[in-house]
């Protein structure tokens, strides 16, 4: 699983919680870093913040979907404090959406459901 978020506290929280749930987790601080990681690691699921510096979640998702490397079908779980998340999710063909601030007790089952379907 790839967790992409520019907030180090959120990255650490998700990394720890998902590892405790048995997932292999690789963190990234922005979309550019995530694409570099994906040269050597193919995640089953990508947990993706939409608002980040350098390369935001929109840019990352669009680049991922345009690639011809077998990565375009990886499910995305979007994280965002932005409103109108359903529009974002539909535009990016996301598997699920999670509004910030989030509750781990709601977030973890959603991610597990997406991962089990991947």
Indicate residue ranges for each PLM-predicted region.
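Receiver (REC) domain active-site loop signature in two-component systems and cognate sites
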Residues: 52
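C-terminal output helix
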Residues: 102-113
